[in-house]
Amino acid sequence: MGGAISMRRSKPAGDLRQKLLRARGETYGRLLGEVEDGSSQSLGGLGKGLSSRSCEGQKYNQGQYMNTPWRNPAEEKEKLAYRKQNMDDIDEEDDDLVGVSVRPKVPLRAMTYKLAIDMSHFIKEKGGLEGIYYSARRHRILDMYLEKEEGIIPDWQDYTSGPGIRYPKTFGWLWKLVPVNVSDEAQEDERHYLMQPAQTSKWDDPWGEVLAWKFDPTPAYTYEAYVRYPEEFGSKSGLSEEEVRRRLTARGLLNMADKKETR
């Protein structure tokens, strides 16, 4: 599936994986020079993947970027606040990071079942999302990329709430999110912390799980999200309001559901 599509779009799809992998790299490149002396040597092979713009010397101040390592131990509450802060500070760089045209190249259109399947296989054939850590920023990059390159309105990407495997709510999208284990040593190691975004994605997740994209063809035939968690679809599930609330409460999701509109 997707043979003709692959020939037509081979270059853009290959670029998408690199853009996602660099989603945190640019931020890291900016702060490394101030965190350690001789940062170019410490980066090793990773430095080759960073643009010259991202590696230019810029003064780093504590708290300027989220998820940067600290030299002095902090209280757990302070660590949590520090790691979660300033996500908005990098929003303005998203367009530049994605590197796509400002305006969509094709007319805007809604994501459909067939289009979701085509895009899923096309991305898979080009190396796509497999094994890439999920984060709120990478979520936005994928939305922006498909909007600008394919004209897909960015209202389609949604997953079940967890905890555990997050199934796509868009029927036909074949990329789910699976929890992955990151060792305690890796989470505490500053070098690993700089190079891997696993420590950043857990703060994007209300359950504190580290998630990665994984291809799964099953949702092409079975609406896994709806079958497993109909309560997350609200009135569209066919369940009574009382049953929806009961199920959400049992899963610890009622407070989250109250904060956003039930779909």
Swiss-Prot record:
<keyword id="KW-0945">Host-virus interaction</keyword>
<comment type="function">
    <text>Seems to play a role in optimizing the host cell environment for viral replication without causing cell death by apoptosis. Enhances virus infectivity and pathogenicity. Probably involved in viral immune evasion mechanisms.</text>
</comment>
<keyword id="KW-1043">Host membrane</keyword>
<dbReference type="GO" id="GO:0005525">
    <property type="term" value="F:GTP binding"/>
</dbReference>
<dbReference type="InterPro" id="IPR027481">
    <property type="entry name" value="HIV-1_Nef_core_sf"/>
</dbReference>
<feature type="lipid moiety-binding region" description="N-myristoyl glycine; by host">
    <location>
        <position position="2"/>
    </location>
</feature>
<keyword id="KW-0449">Lipoprotein</keyword>
<dbReference type="GO" id="GO:0020002">
    <property type="term" value="C:host cell plasma membrane"/>
</dbReference>
<feature type="region of interest" description="Mediates dimerization">
    <location>
        <begin position="140"/>
        <end position="156"/>
    </location>
</feature>
<comment type="similarity">
    <text>Belongs to the lentivirus primate group Nef protein family.</text>
</comment>
<keyword id="KW-1032">Host cell membrane</keyword>
<feature type="region of interest" description="Acidic">
    <location>
        <begin position="88"/>
        <end position="96"/>
    </location>
</feature>
<dbReference type="InterPro" id="IPR001558">
    <property type="entry name" value="HIV_Nef"/>
</dbReference>
<comment type="subunit">
    <text>Homodimer. Interacts with host CD247/TCRZ; this interaction induces down-regulation of cell surface TCR/CD3 complexes.</text>
</comment>
<protein>
    <recommendedName>
        <fullName>Protein Nef</fullName>
    </recommendedName>
</protein>
<feature type="region of interest" description="Disordered">
    <location>
        <begin position="31"/>
        <end position="54"/>
    </location>
</feature>
<keyword id="KW-0843">Virulence</keyword>
<keyword id="KW-0899">Viral immunoevasion</keyword>
<dbReference type="GO" id="GO:0016020">
    <property type="term" value="C:membrane"/>
</dbReference>
<keyword id="KW-0472">Membrane</keyword>
<keyword id="KW-0519">Myristate</keyword>
<dbReference type="Pfam" id="PF00469">
    <property type="entry name" value="F-protein"/>
</dbReference>
<comment type="function">
    <text>In infected CD4(+) T-lymphocytes, down-regulates cell surface expression of CD4, CD28, CD3, and MHC-I or MHC-II molecules.</text>
</comment>
